[in-house]
Amino acid sequence: KGRPAPVSVWCSAASTGEEPYSIAITLIEALGDSAARSASILATDLDTQVLAKAEAGIYTYDQVKHLSPERLKRFFLKGTGLQAGRVKVRPELRAMIRFEQLNLTDADYGIAKPFDAIFCRNVMIYFDKPTQGQVLSRFEPLVKPGGLLFAGHSENFTYVTQAFRLRGQTVYELTRDAAQGMRPRVAQAPAAAAMPSPVRARAAGAESAYGDRG
């Protein structure tokens, strides 16, 4: 709360979608239902196969067992027939998120507007220090003044960059000096990567197999 609307978030390692959907749920619960209309989440990953699963938004009960019954009913549809034992995110939750393929080691991400927060958790541990520094330098113009960078518990960027200062155990804030040195990006956002058609077909075919939870 306290950030001017509309709120924008980048989940830079979306995997199969649990994190971006959790962020969307948190925004709705923190800001109210209006967040579903104004907030936006960019969810990216290098792997288009996991992105296809994320875009489908279908999970087993075991994958969502940590959610309360109230959250399950509010944000998910219950599978029936061949989809029994599964849940699917509701369309209004899915509409908050844009899924795209992106490689964090690319020189230019093609993202034009900065975010209120970037989630990059448990990814940097696979990069050496020079690569970590390069990725963090690309994050600088993509974080709004006072914006946050969320890292994993095993990641520490204190000795990698001076642009972000540690604010909490795994939370970094863009420093004032870095924010004042920001330059507008003119690159256009790339078109969303095409997802594997079999996954899209299966998701479309299962659309009618989900309904409100009883």
What residues fall within each predicted segment?
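A short glycine-rich, Lys/Arg-flanked "PGG" loop and its adjoining helix->strand segment in the class I
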Residues: 133-145
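Conserved beta-strand signature within the Rossmann-like core of class I S-adenosyl-L-methionine
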Residues: 145-153
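Short hydrophobic/aromatic beta-strand or adjacent loop that forms the aromatic wall/cage
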Residues: 167-171
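Conserved class I S-adenosyl-L-methionine
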Residues: 4-23, 39-42
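Short, well-ordered amphipathic alpha-helices
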Residues: 20-31, 55
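A short N-terminal interaction module
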Residues: 1-2, 7, 116-117
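Extended basic-aromatic, gly/pro-enriched interface segments that bind polyanionic ligands
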Residues: 12, 33-119, 123-131, 157
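Intrinsically disordered or compositionally simple regulatory linkers and C-terminal tails
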Residues: 173-213
